[in-house]
Every structure is written in structure tokens, then in C-alpha cells.
């Protein structure tokens, strides 16, 4: 059972062995770790080089740096102490084993430092989600987007929207409370409606970009499709830079979906090799064809490969057409085709450039504000309530005010002011110990 009154500790840097290991302690007794192991606590935010010793015996554990960050001016909002050690496994184990013996100290649970930062008002829910995304970011676009989120880009936008919404609500409530007293202007709902309409426009713009944010966060899917023996697996291997797929002149060799992860245009991409699309009586191959169609339909971009100009299915949305085996056929291709030879590499750079261009159109530009389905749903709820408030006829200010209050509550859900515990539990399960 975890208690917020405990002082928690953990290795907060990367996996050992490493050049330097950082052990962090946070909680009401964090100072005592410095006194017990180093015999001192340095001034706030000042590093001191000290000998760390086992309390009682005086045995030397290591020599390193000690820093102290008193709450609330710390990452967690609590007193926090850091020990910067040599990154050997035995050194780290010895220090952790010593800390666990101190009264009131216990090992931190996964994500517990961040949970305390949230509880102490250092981070809101959107920022915690951004930090979770930053920890697992693989591509440059994911890093930039997660960093913007964890730095409060969405939180600041929501705070501004909420402030304006509360101002509009106050105007409507003033109309309700004081309209008969002559202390307020006759038409306060007009400015309130204007503000609500402006908010609707801004939320609509943010939501229109949500799909891009979620795509960048999750990574893009590019499916390689085409008839059997069109060179799909050969192209996959060429783009992956390794022999990821079996290549055979026998049509129907690829029967299942094969995935390779790579980066293009700063984006995380899953490249999917699919079974050749054709009619077949082979039950296993037929299942592969079915799966290929499903993956192609759910992908962000389809590369349609053919060595003879076979057209893609009419229900396939705007594929990038690629004429393969140029080294064998010598074909020049149609105007909308890119001609390549995956064997010799001819045309591959042109193909990659076009793939990167299309990925840039789908996921480029400044980081999106909305990056998760939960955020999108909450903002959609706020937009719905604002639209409902604007639809209210005059002289029904009570109902209009209620819709504005519900819109404010929906905005609160974005940053975790309400209904937050279940989301936090799910989030912190994805965090590492020490974060």
C-alpha cells in the first residue's frame, strides 16, 4: 500500500551500468537521506561532492554529488534529494539497500514521482500525458509534439478558453440575478453569445487538427500492396535496410502481414508488407489476402506495386502507384507512377522523397494541441455544450447558463480538474520506476 506521507526513492536515470546514476528521494524525510549517508544537506540547488557512507558502520558506499530541492520549489512539490553516483550496478544496489533501511523510506511505485507532482499542482493531466508520450517518443515529430504537450501547450490553451467561458457565464448569470434591479445593462447575453461563438470557432479548429496529433503520436502506417510477385517484399527489405521478408519468385509466398518500423521525414512509420491481392482457392493464402485488404484500408498511405501497370482496386483510396522491376522490364511507367528497381536501387530515392512529402502533408507543421482520444472527446463535449447554449432562444438564460457550466466542466476534464483518477491509474501503469 502506498502512502503520500512516505518518503519514496528510486533510480531515476537510465538502466545501469552507465556513466552516472541518479537516485532520487522525495517526501517529508528526504533531507534525512543526506544527513544519514553524507552527514550534510547542501544549500538548496547547490551540488556538493561528498563521500556516501553506510549509517552506523561508516563503510564507504561511493563518492558523488548531492543536491537538495526544498518543496514546493521542486519537481514533485515536495522536499527532494538527489544523489549522483557512479553508474555501476553494485554501487546503485548498495545505495538503494541503504535507503530502504531508513525510517519512513520506501521504494517508489511506477510513476509515483509524477503522481506526486500532479497531486501537488506541478503538472496537470494533459502535461502528465505529454510526459508519458515523451518517454516513449521514437521520432523527431513525436518528441516535438510530446514536449509541447508536457510543457503545457494544451493546458495554456484550455486555461484561456475556460477563463473566457467563465466570463461569458458570469454575464448570463448577472442577467438572471440582477435583471430586475436595474443594476446591469439590459443585454448582457449578447456579449456572452459572441464570446461563446468565438470559442466554438477556436475549439472547432483545434479538433480539426486532432487527427493529425493522434497520427503523429501513434505513428503512421504505410501498406505495401499489389498483385502477387510484384516485388513487395523486396521493396520492404530495401526500405528497411535488412532482410525482413522472405523473397521468392513463387507467387503467394507472403501469406501474412509483416511489419517493419522505421523513420521517414521525422515521423514514426510502420511499413506493412501484405499478401498479393488475387483470387485464390488456397484457404491460407485467401486469409492473407483478406488481411491485406483490411490493413490497406486502415493505413495512412498505400504503395500500390505492379510490374506490368495493373491498376489498383477502385475502392483503394488514392494509392501511390509504383512500377517495379525496372531493371527487368525497362518500363517507363505511367505519368502517375514512380518507376523503381528494388534490386538495383534505381528510383528508390525518388520514391522515398514522395513518401516523405506525403507524410509531411499529413503530419508536418507545428505540434498539434490535441494528441489523445480522451482529450478529443472532452473538447468535443465542450463544443457540443457551447453549440447548445447558442441555440437557446432569448429569455431562457437559466438553460443557457447550464450549458455553459457543462462546457466548463468538459474543459476541466481535459486537464484533469475532474474525473481524473481512472485516467491517472491507467497512465502511471505505463511509467517506469523512478519517473
From Swiss-Prot:
K(+) binds at residues 229, 248, 250, 253. Binds 1 potassium ion per subunit. Pfam families: MMR_HSR1 (PF01926), MnmE_helical (PF12631), TrmE_N (PF10396). Residues 219-360 form the TrmE-type G domain. Homodimer. Heterotetramer of two MnmE and two MnmG subunits. Exhibits a very high intrinsic GTPase hydrolysis rate. Involved in the addition of a carboxymethylaminomethyl (cmnm) group at the wobble position (U34) of certain tRNAs, forming tRNA-cmnm(5)s(2)U34. This is tRNA modification GTPase MnmE. It comes from Azorhizobium caulinodans (strain ATCC 43989 / DSM 5975 / JCM 20966 / LMG 6465 / NBRC 14845 / NCIMB 13405 / ORS 571).
